[in-house]
């Protein structure tokens, strides 16, 4: 109940702020957004809610794990700082250490890039950035390395909304899965504590 109520309040705030920005933009520019642009913004706001839901669930998990409020708050901030700042630095060090030689084949280079990209996608912020960039920029056609065979024959035109959603579906699934996992762990810990107290 605490999670659902908090998420509803955050979702309402995000949608209100998003529509306020759209309204100010309409007043300043004078050009209304198209239907596809409007729905892109709506899906961007929904993605933002999923991202916030993950951190909210993680904060609830730490509040159940640690009895002191200050400790749980510091743990949440520490995890956020790690993934936002230090995780990228660690992945860059790994990338430099595992970088292929100049004589490597294109497929080895692509495999290396996919591996590093997979490490980066372990961070929720990276999943959120990839999803929002693809949703808000129709010119983004792929968020991973491509071979020359895949590039050849591609039409250089903006992707429709449906195709952009297909591109970012793995990122959205990852955010939802991480949120569900944190929620399940929090629920199990809460039920165990209730059973022991009785």
What would you call each of these model-derived segments?
Residues 22, 26-34, 64-68, 92-100, ...:
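Transmembrane helix-loop junctions in multipass membrane proteins, especially transporters and channels
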Residues 44-87, 92, 101:
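A structural motif at transmembrane helix-loop-helix junctions in multipass membrane proteins
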Residues 6, 10, 14, 77-81, ...:
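Residue-level recognition of pore/gate-forming positions within transmembrane alpha-helices
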Residues 1-2:
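Short helix-to-coil transition segments within interhelical loops
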Residues 5-67:
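Secretory targeting signals
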Residues 173-198:
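Junction motif at the cytosolic side of a transmembrane helix
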């Amino acid at each position: 109940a605490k999670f659902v109520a908090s998420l509803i309040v955050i979702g309402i705030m995000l949608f209100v702020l998003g529509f306020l920005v759209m309204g100010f933009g309409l007043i300043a520019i004078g050009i209304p957004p198209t239907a596809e642009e409007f729905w892109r913004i709506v899906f961007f706001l929904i993605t933002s809610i999923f991202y916030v839901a993950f951190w909210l669930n993680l904060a609830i998990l730490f509040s159940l794990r640690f009895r002191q409020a200050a400790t749980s708050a510091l743990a949440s901030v520490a995890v956020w700082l790690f993934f936002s700042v230090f995780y990228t630095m660690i992945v860059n060090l790994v990338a430099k250490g595992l970088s292929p030689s100049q004589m490597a084949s294109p497929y080895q280079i692509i495999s290396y890039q996919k591996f590093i990209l997979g490490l980066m996608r372990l961070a929720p912020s990276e999943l959120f950035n990839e999803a929002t960039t693809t949703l808000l920029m129709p010119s983004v056609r792929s968020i991973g390395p491509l071979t020359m065979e895949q590039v050849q024959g591609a039409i250089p035109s903006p992707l429709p909304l449906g195709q952009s959603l297909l591109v970012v579906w793995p990122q959205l699934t990852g955010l939802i899965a991480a949120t569900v996992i944190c929620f399940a762990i929090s629920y199990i810990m809460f039920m165990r504590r209730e059973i022991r107290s009785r």
